[in-house]
């Protein structure tokens, strides 16, 4: 799985997951366009809270 992480003011949050890198890259662009106040990037690991909520 590939995860999209959101970082803003030292806060880290996993916002989405995708089975393929191609899908994740396409959505990463959308996240970056829709919210310019945070930094979005791809990761192979989710944040701790993501695993707890799944």
What are these regions (language model features)?
Residues 13, 25, 29-54:
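Short, mixed-charge low-complexity intrinsically disordered segments
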